[in-house]
């Protein structure tokens, strides 16, 4: 079992079998992704041109290749085959704000496990896999390739950045990367017809992110995995609570009214975040890090 604050490569490898029980990612295909005459019910981007052959009685005249027919002076039609694999691109947040937890595991560890489970799901499906793992100062990008070629290196990236955020705590990086930065850097690697999973707490979701997510949505399906700790639901009604963020520390007393204020504030923020993403056409999955991750993913991704 992996540590509560960092993952091991072995623990991510052991998730392969569990990934089989995750429901396939969304299969809707945007109209711009179609390459053929019909929408495929399987994963993929429609129909790809395969070859030409002579026209035979009963063939669909819509498949006529008029250039070849004119050149050869006999009727020829275009044959297509169905592309059944689909690019899967995973963006994994391993920045300092993800290094938080009150019990079980940090958000950074949960994000690492979610990414590994989804990567293994793509491996079982034979989908091309790509990804981006980012910390506060740098990042690793991998273009979509056959899963056997990408998966080992992607898991290494996850482990490296997961350990880096744990090792760096509590030091803060100047001018850390933003979620908008990573969406921008990843955009050129994401092709039409892709399924994109963004695994983050989305604490810095802003107008730049909105524009970039809208651009990504025009290329394919997006699922957001919002990792969160459920501390706000477990606060006592009395006592002292200490908090630290970005170098600032504070201690305040809890009361029933103060507790209700905190619960309302956090709940409202999460609801606004979900509404904002949903308006962009992003499927939102709120993942509580203190609960069983696999069961939450089995509800649908």
Where are these regions (language model features)?
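Exposed, interaction-prone extracellular/peripheral surfaces
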Residues: 1-41, 54-59, 68, 77-113, ...
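A positional/architectural concept
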Residues: 43-46
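N-terminal juxtadomain amphipathic helix
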Residues: 61-63
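Active-site SXXK
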Residues: 118
């Amino acid at each position: 079992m992996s540590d509560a604050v960092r993952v091991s490569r072995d623990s991510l490898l052991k998730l392969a079998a569990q990934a089989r029980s995750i429901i396939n990612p969304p299969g809707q295909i945007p109209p711009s992704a179609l390459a053929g005459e019909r929408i495929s019910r399987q994963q993929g981007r429609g129909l790809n041109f395969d070859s030409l052959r002579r026209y035979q009685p009963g063939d669909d005249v819509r498949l006529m290749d008029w250039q070849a027919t004119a050149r050869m002076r006999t009727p020829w039609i275009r044959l297509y085959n169905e592309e059944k694999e689909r690019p899967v691109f995973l963006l994994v947040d391993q920045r300092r704000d993800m290094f938080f937890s009150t019990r079980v595991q940090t958000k950074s560890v949960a994000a690492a496990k979610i990414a590994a489970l989804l990567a293994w799901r793509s491996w079982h499906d034979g989908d091309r896999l790509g990804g981006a793992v980012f910390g506060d100062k740098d990042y690793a990008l991998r273009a979509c390739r056959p899963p056997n070629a990408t998966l080992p290196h992607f898991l290494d990236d996850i482990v490296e950045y997961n350990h880096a955020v744990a090792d760096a705590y509590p030091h803060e990086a100047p001018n850390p990367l933003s979620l908008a930065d990573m969406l921008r850097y990843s955009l050129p690697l994401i092709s039409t017809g892709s399924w994109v999973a963004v695994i983050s707490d989305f604490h810095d979701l802003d107008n730049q992110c909105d524009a970039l997510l809208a651009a990504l949505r025009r290329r394919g399906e997006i699922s957001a995995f919002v990792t969160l700790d459920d501390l706000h639901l477990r606060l006592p009604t009395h006592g002292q609570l200490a908090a630290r963020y970005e170098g600032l520390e504070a201690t305040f007393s809890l009361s029933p009214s103060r507790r209700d204020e905190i619960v309302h504030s956090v709940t409202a923020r999460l609801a606004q975040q979900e509404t904002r993403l949903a308006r962009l056409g992003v499927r939102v999955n709120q993942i509580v890090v203190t609960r069983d991750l696999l069961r939450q993913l089995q509800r649908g991704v």
